[in-house]
């Protein structure tokens, strides 16, 4: 294949531009380390204690409740208590089969 002088020149310029860009990114990383990245920002964010307490409450509820006697015993995770088991309400053919099985 024959390439024109213009296409070779453009390819060379583009390659050099990519190397310069990668060099700038690498230089920034070498100077600042992880501090310049989004991962570092996420690690440094404070923990939302209200959300953690709510999650802990749900986990405690699930671990303390082996069976259910009413919908309230399902910890709000599934809508219905069926035959002592917290089961989601599923419609259609699958729901009918699950309903008969439970």
Curated annotation (Swiss-Prot):
<dbReference type="GO" id="GO:0019871">
    <property type="term" value="F:sodium channel inhibitor activity"/>
</dbReference>
<feature type="disulfide bond">
    <location>
        <begin position="74"/>
        <end position="86"/>
    </location>
</feature>
<comment type="function">
    <text>Potent inhibitor of insect, but not mammalian, voltage-gated calcium channels (Cav).</text>
</comment>
<feature type="modified residue" description="Leucine amide">
    <location>
        <position position="98"/>
    </location>
</feature>
<dbReference type="InterPro" id="IPR012628">
    <property type="entry name" value="Toxin_23"/>
</dbReference>
<comment type="similarity">
    <text>Belongs to the neurotoxin 15 family. 02 (omega-actx) subfamily.</text>
</comment>
<keyword id="KW-0800">Toxin</keyword>
<keyword id="KW-0528">Neurotoxin</keyword>
<dbReference type="InterPro" id="IPR013139">
    <property type="entry name" value="Omega_atracotoxin_CS2"/>
</dbReference>
<feature type="signal peptide">
    <location>
        <begin position="1"/>
        <end position="23"/>
    </location>
</feature>
<keyword id="KW-0872">Ion channel impairing toxin</keyword>
<dbReference type="GO" id="GO:0005576">
    <property type="term" value="C:extracellular region"/>
</dbReference>
<keyword id="KW-0732">Signal</keyword>
<dbReference type="Pfam" id="PF08093">
    <property type="entry name" value="Toxin_23"/>
</dbReference>
<keyword id="KW-0027">Amidation</keyword>
<keyword id="KW-0964">Secreted</keyword>
<dbReference type="GO" id="GO:0090729">
    <property type="term" value="F:toxin activity"/>
</dbReference>
<keyword id="KW-0108">Calcium channel impairing toxin</keyword>
<feature type="propeptide">
    <location>
        <begin position="100"/>
        <end position="102"/>
    </location>
</feature>
<keyword id="KW-1015">Disulfide bond</keyword>
<feature type="disulfide bond">
    <location>
        <begin position="68"/>
        <end position="81"/>
    </location>
</feature>
<feature type="propeptide">
    <location>
        <begin position="24"/>
        <end position="56"/>
    </location>
</feature>
<keyword id="KW-0960">Knottin</keyword>
<protein>
    <recommendedName>
        <fullName>Omega-hexatoxin-Hi2b</fullName>
    </recommendedName>
</protein>
<keyword id="KW-1218">Voltage-gated calcium channel impairing toxin</keyword>
<dbReference type="GO" id="GO:0005246">
    <property type="term" value="F:calcium channel regulator activity"/>
</dbReference>
<feature type="disulfide bond">
    <location>
        <begin position="61"/>
        <end position="75"/>
    </location>
</feature>
């Amino acid at each position: 294949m024959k390439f024109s002088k213009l296409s070779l020149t453009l390819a060379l310029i583009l390659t050099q531009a990519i190397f310069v860009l990668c060099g700038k990114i690498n230089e920034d990383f070498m100077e600042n380390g992880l501090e310049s990245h989004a991962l570092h920002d996420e690690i440094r964010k404070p923990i939302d204690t209200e959300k953690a307490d709510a999650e802990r409450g749900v986990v405690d509820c699930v671990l303390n409740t082996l069976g259910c006697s009413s919908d309230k015993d399902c910890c709000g995770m599934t809508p219905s208590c069926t035959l002592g088991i917290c089961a989601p309400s599923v419609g259609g053919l699958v729901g009918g089969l699950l309903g008969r099985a439970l």
